[in-house]
């Protein structure tokens, strides 16, 4: 078993086992710098509030939210809401936040920020997830995206090893493009980079084979990680 210092950079896959990570700028930076959304930042608490130019959407990041619901995206008329937890990979959060301007009709930078049109069941099959009775389940059974069309929350992503709240919730009337983009980046097979201290405890201690070091990679961190996963036991095909 490899020993890591807290600040060692490591590669982790699958992404839903990697925790949030530290690339907060990817989730909020494009809205501010590319699309001119207004922002308020409380340096003492880390709270960030971002509003769309027309005032129809706001994005709220609150890292001291007591229930761990760090992210809220809300739209007015019709009202819909998306929430992400403190363990949701920022790659998946950013895939949703960066899609917001385009979904509101601002097509600038659309070529740089694609919104996938692949149906969710095809995305699941592409990445080895199973689909049954409205539930999309990861190959290792650790993560699910559940569709409950008759409830107020119509999509819910949950993780077997993380405490509540869910990784993500989507209420009725959320554009499905947001759900697709989130799911595409949650299930993508490419490993993500983390500081070891940011990797969830359950992954560090119970699934340490999912972690490989960045430093000392023979080919590249991504390739070395992929090769290390080829013979990992317990993978459902």
Predicted regions and their residues:
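Compositionally biased accessory segments in Actinobacterial proteins
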Residues: 1-237
């Amino acid at each position: 078993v490899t020993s890591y210092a807290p600040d060692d950079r490591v590669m982790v896959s699958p992404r839903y086992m990697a925790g949030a990570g530290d690339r907060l700028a990817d989730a909020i930076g494009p809205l501010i710098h590319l699309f001119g959304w207004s922002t308020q930042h409380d340096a003492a608490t880390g709270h960030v509030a971002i509003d769309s130019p027309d005032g129809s959407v706001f994005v709220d990041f609150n890292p001291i939210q007591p229930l761990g619901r760090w992210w809220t995206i809300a739209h007015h008329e019709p009202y819909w809401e998306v929430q992400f937890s403190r363990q949701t990979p920022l790659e998946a959060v950013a895939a949703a936040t960066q899609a917001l301007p385009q979904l509101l009709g601002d097509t600038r930078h659309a070529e740089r920020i694609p919104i996938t049109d692949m149906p969710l069941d095809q995305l699941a099959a592409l990445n080895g997830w199973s689909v049954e009775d409205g539930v999309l389940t990861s190959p290792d059974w650790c993560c699910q995206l559940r569709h409950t069309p008759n409830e107020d929350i119509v999509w819910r992503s949950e993780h077997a090893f993380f405490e509540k709240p869910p990784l993500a919730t989507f209420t009725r009337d959320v554009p499905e493009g947001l759900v697709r983009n989130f799911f595409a980046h949650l299930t993508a097979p490419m490993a993500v980079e983390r500081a070891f201290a940011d990797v969830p405890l359950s992954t560090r201690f119970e699934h340490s084979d999912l972690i490989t070091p960045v430093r000392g990679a023979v080919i590249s961190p991504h390739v070395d990680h992929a090769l290390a996963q080829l013979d990992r036991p317990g993978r459902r095909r």
